[in-house]
Amino acid sequence: MRQCQRSPIGIFDSGVGGLTVLRELYRRLPNESILYFADTARLPYGTRSAGEILQFVREIMDWMTSQQVKMVIMACNTSSALALEAIRDEFALPVLGVILPGARAAVQKGKRIGVIATPATAASNAYRQAIEEIDSTAQVWQVGCPDFVPLIEQNRLYEPYTKEVAKQYLNPLLQVNIDTLVYGCTHYRHLEPLFRQILPPSISLVDPAQYVVSAAEKELELLGLKSTLPCLPTRFCVSGNPETFANLSRQWLGYIPRVDKVYLPVKIRSSMSLEVLE
């Protein structure tokens, strides 16, 4: 059991969005070792088809299991919306998504709920369905935001253009008088200072990262896998440029991490695993 407790939690996202989940894990579960994977070679996920997303996630999960993780958190709303159920059926370890924890938190905050998300997540109606299943009286408005992830990954958070884009996306939600805004993409927490400049203070902001970590903690306790041992250093792996990810993530981690390059072969078969390049 001690060996299982010592095994890392796997987190994956298309890029730096999952760092919001990572920071919450550091805060809530300081004894847990973590393996973070960013599929930066294929971001953004939000404009991909459902078939592509499922293919990508299967490849990542094959590699994650080869790294002997004890749990995987899909720190990516698009993957959670389009691949979570299929992946849970195919892999034996616990796999958590961010949508249901975010939906549960949203209905506790208000009844007029806006969701900003990638186009793929918005089109899936995953948040609308989850929220309405929990509270049929809640009203949900969704806006697809294709430009946010590229702007964040390009580190253009504080440019006037980014603020104008944010206003364009948020204005339809302000017009219907939402009382709650859900970050339907883990990247969007990085834009929170900008959102606070645009939104009235009466609107509650829901970051699903906070709530998926709470769910992960409960799951680990239930399975007897919560670590009571000191953690190992976090491993960072990417499919794209390690230096780009390291430099971009510095502002949220507070240090420049060591990042390993991981090669994702472009294969049709979903069973292909990933290989770490030496």
Curated annotation (Swiss-Prot):
Entry protein name: Glutamate racemase
Instruction: Write down the chemical reaction(s) this protein catalyses.
Output: L-glutamate = D-glutamate
Q: Does the keyword Thylakoid apply?
A: no
Supply the source organism for this entry.
Gloeothece citriformis (strain PCC 7424) (Cyanothece sp. (strain PCC 7424))
PROSITE patterns for this protein? ASP_GLU_RACEMASE_1, ASP_GLU_RACEMASE_2
HAMAP family in alphabetical order: Glu_racemase
Q: What does this protein do?
A: Provides the (R)-glutamate required for cell wall biosynthesis.
Residues recorded as binding substrate, renumbered to this chain, are: 13-14, 45-46, 77-78, 186-187
Q: What metabolic or biological pathway is this protein involved in?
A: Cell wall biogenesis; peptidoglycan biosynthesis
Q: Which GO terms describe its biological process?
A: cell wall organization; peptidoglycan biosynthetic process; regulation of cell shape
Q: What is its EC number?
A: 5.1.1.3
InterPro entries with a match to the protein in the record: Asp/Glu/hydantoin_racemase, Asp/Glu_race, Asp/Glu_racemase_AS_1, Asp/Glu_racemase_AS_2, Glu_race
Q: Name one GO molecular function term.
A: glutamate racemase activity
Q: Name one Pfam family in it.
A: Asp_Glu_race
Q: Which sites are catalytic? A: 76, 185
Q: What class of enzyme is it?
A: isomerase
Keywords assigned: Cell shape, Cell wall biogenesis/degradation, Isomerase, Peptidoglycan synthesis
Instruction: Spell out the family assignment given in the record's similarity comment.
Output: Belongs to the aspartate/glutamate racemases family.
